[in-house]
UniProtKB/Swiss-Prot annotation:
The keyword Metal-binding applies. GO terms for molecular function: anthranilate phosphoribosyltransferase activity; magnesium ion binding. Anthranilate 2 binds at R164. Mg(2+) 1 binds at S90, E223. GO terms for cellular component: cytosol. Pathway: Amino-acid biosynthesis; L-tryptophan biosynthesis; L-tryptophan from chorismate: step 2/5. Its cofactor is Mg(2+). Binds 2 magnesium ions per monomer. 5-phospho-alpha-D-ribose 1-diphosphate binds at residues 78, 81-82, 86, 88-91, 106-114, 118. Its EC number is 2.4.2.18. It comes from Halobacterium salinarum (strain ATCC 700922 / JCM 11081 / NRC-1). This is Anthranilate phosphoribosyltransferase. The lineage of its organism: Archaea, Methanobacteriati, Methanobacteriota, Stenosarchaea group, Halobacteria.
Length: 336
């Protein structure tokens, strides 16, 4: 570990394999001081795509694995950290995508940037978070969606909680949640809090052999936005293409950011339920339709973002999204 600290502190970039080894050492055989020193040195130098991919691979190596018999398998997960208190867009979008027939392995945690993260809102809906891997696999295979609460599937992260808290600043671990799905989802929509991270995380995903992904920053949000243009990098195997999309790309109208404002877990749970049942319309539904449409697109269920949005809207209007929420709530509520 000392060698890695010295190399990074001197401005040297780690290879993917070295970064993968470094995170394994952080989890298994490093002091708090060493953990803090390496994370601080990486932040000061600036993390490269190889270092991000290597850390993510190391985290996945140490994770409790979920292996449903589904291909492709989609996740909608952002980095958080965008400092907007919106509704739970990615969580609601995951339910809608699953309702459209796209197998979904949702990975999430408690709040980072808002009053309610994925785990907060699902907890408010009565979904059991501490789920067994085999049960999650069964839910994905049977109902089309399963939820993985990150702390339950990444026990190695316990070793870095203290040093991260003591540093008090963002580190490489703030980027890794979307890249470390325990089910190794091979089709992803990844939101990032900084537009400069869009190409970096896209190249990291490509190096991790993800089949298809969209990495997006939407006018300040780690989601596709309605209040402005979104910068998006599409990963298709080894190819990464960056472009800009607008709400009209999805066939949707623009709306101010305040129109998708959220609240605490209970309020966001009510919005989530209202959106998937079709009772809540307007911009909150539209931003979910856009992001679910993106998930449907990367999951192979549509040949364009607009077509994906159409399928997302149909999943809501047909009752399929509501059925998916009911299945997730009923199944996870009885698991231990």
């Amino acid at each position: 570990m000392q060698e890695y600290i010295e190399r990074v502190a001197a401005g040297e970039d780690l290879s993917l394999d070295a970064a993968r080894d470094a995170v394994t050492t952080l989890f298994e055989d490093a002091t708090d001081a060493e953990i803090g020193a390496l994370l601080g040195a990486l932040r000061a130098k600036g993390e490269t795509e190889a270092e991000i991919a290597g850390f993510a691979q190391g985290m996945r190596d140490a994770a409790i694995t979920v292996a449903p018999d589904c291909t492709p398998l989609v996740d909608t997960c952002g980095t958080g950290g965008d400092d907007y208190d919106t509704i739970n867009v990615s969580t609601t979008a995951a339910l809608v995508a699953a309702g459209a027939g796209i197998p979904t392995a949702k990975h999430g945690n408690y709040s980072v940037s808002s009053a309610s993260g994925s785990s907060d809102v699902l907890d408010a809906l009565g979904v059991e978070l501490a789920t067994d891997p085999a049960a999650v696999e069964a839910r994905i295979e049977t109902d089309g969606i399963g939820y993985m609460h990150a702390p339950a599937f990444h026990p190695g992260m316990e070793a870095v909680i203290g040093p991260r808290r003591d540093l008090g600043v963002r580190t490489i671990f703030n980027l890794l949640g979307p890249l470390t799905n325990p089910a190794r989802a091979d089709a992803q929509v990844v939101g990032v809090y900084d537009p400069a991270l869009v190409p970096v995380l896209a190249r990291a995903l490509s190096r991790m052999a993800v089949d298809r992904a969209l990495v997006v920053h939407g006018a300040g949000l780690d989601e596709f936005a309605l209040h402005g243009d979104s910068t998006v990098a599409e990963v298709d195997g080894d190819t990464v293409t960056t472009t800009t999309v607008s709400p009209s790309t999805f066939g949707l109208a623009e709306a101010p950011i305040d129109a998708v404002a959220g609240g605490g877990p209970e309020a966001n749970a009510a919005d989530l339920r209202g959106i998937v049942t079709g009772e809540l319309t307007g911009p909150k539904r539209d931003i979910v339709v856009a992001n679910a449409g993106a998930a449907i697109y990367v999951g192979g269920g549509a040949d364009s973002l607009a077509a994906g949005a159409d399928r997302a809207a149909a999943a809501i209007d047909s009752g399929a999204a509501a059925d998916t929420l009911a299945a997730l709530t009923d199944a996870h509520a009885v698991q231990q």
